[in-house]
Amino acid sequence: MALPELQTLRYELHDGIATITLHRPDKLNAFTTRMGGELIAAFDHTDADDAVRAVIVTGAGRAFCAGADLSGGGQTFDYAARPQAAQQETRVGEVYRDGGGRVTLRIYRSLKPVIGAINGAAVGIGMTLQLPMDMRLASTEARFGFVFARRGITPEAASSWFLPRLVGMQTALEWCFTGRVFAAQEALERGLVRSLHAPDELLPA
C-alpha cells in the first residue's frame, strides 16, 4: 500500500522502525484536519507493510503538538464549510467521531506497537493523541495539559475512555477539571509516561 504525499508529517523507515513525525514546526505542530487524515493514512500504511515492526510518533522542533490549529478563528470548527466535511462525519463503528477521535481510534487499532516520543509541549489534542499509544516516553522538557475546560469544551478524541485507564479516575478528573499545564516529572509520577530522557536522548531510547 503506497503512502500518499504527506504535507504535515514526515515518514521514515529504518531497521523495521517507522518514525512518524508531526511536521509543522513553525506552528508547534498544531493539529489540522489534513494532519488527521495523513495520520490515519500513515497507520494504514504501517499496518500493511510487513517491513514495519514498530512505530514511533514524535514532533518536529520544540513541540510534540500544541493542540488544534485555531488560526481559522470562529471558522475553525465550521466543518460544513470545508470540502473535507464528509471525512469529519465518518463513522467509527456505529458512532460519529470528531476528527481527533477518528485518529486516536485508528492508532488504538494499530497492528504494530506504537511508541510516543513526546519531545515538547503536548496540550489539547497533543495530549489526547498519545493516549492510545502502547508506550509513552518523554523529554525532560515536555509539558502536558488537558486544557479543554479552560476553553469551555469537553475533552475529545475518546480521551474520557483512555485517560482513566492510564492514570486512574482521580488523576484524570483533576487534570480535566483544572485544565492546568504540568511538567514531565508529574506525567512520570502519575503514570502517563514510562520514562524521562534528555532531549537529545529521547529518540535513541
Regions found by a protein language model. Give the residues of each.
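Phosphate-coordinating loops and pocket residues in cytosolic domains that bind phosphorylated ligands
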Residues: A30-T33, A66, Q75, R150, ...
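Glycine- (often His-adjacent) and acidic-residue-rich active-site loop
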Residues: G59-R106, A122, G152
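Crotonase-fold acyl-CoA enzyme core
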Residues: L105-A205
